[in-house]
């Protein structure tokens, strides 16, 4: 069952839509609905998601009936992506069977981070008769990895850095050697969408590759030793920034847990392309509420990262319920070239509750005792009660607009209390 505190946040956001402006439903009633009938509450959320998706498609396409079939396919894909995200959250983004498979292979290969890629190439050749070749970008163009099954050839793009080549070798190894394990895990998930199983299988293969590059016990120990210094972890495990940050969110093994980080990746427009929120019982990261039907709060440091590419930015953030989080964010280095997709820009954020911030190197020198208030952030403008926010894009639910021509405040909106 989808975690109740997340469902409450989702329904608050749902009923923050202007279409419900005449129905002022307090949070208490939403909690009552979830307590009495969680399935019905989940159905309301699913119905709104479908409505929201159709509305967004209609606004984007305008009067283009020829595009309706493509729009339906896009909507189905979006639903599948969200379904997989929620399944990963229910699992706390931790998969013990895949961890064990990765540990077994790494032990058999007897490798270090510095020769893992070569060992995987040899393993594919000796066990599966698969030859690996790095190809010019002019040949593969935008493709980074291509497996030619009939030729037993794995082609990797020269645009991939060492960490990317190792990762893609791990992904293809997962598909070839661990196909049955991946299929069993997908089957157990009991996903409802048509595209969900395929998306989840790819995600699990990526998980295997990350576990292969950064073995659980060793990586967790290094993260604690280095106070989660991302750059040093990159060097120690020959991994990329995103690979390291993603791996940190998977450290949820019972009795060997790491910090319960949440992770987000966005583009310059604020579109969320990756979201990982561990949600095991008692977890703090699960309390961080993300907008699931719109953009994130513009006051969050994640959006500032694009103005300082390559730098790690930090922020102590306070939600409207006074829950405080520590977040650090950075842009990702693009993979590719000017010709082949290398101009795409993304930023990622990793965050945790304040009680864990002292164990992160990037919090050194910050006021962690609460003497100074954190930066006020919210879920989305529709459900945020911060009346004086200078970055507010929409008026909040349950507050009538007040027009005073003789008064102008820092916010473009004025409201009745």
Describe the predicted segments one by one.
Residues 1:
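Active-site loops and adjacent core secondary-structure elements that bind or stabilize anionic groups
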Residues 4-417:
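Short juxta-domain linker segments that transition from a proline/glycine-rich
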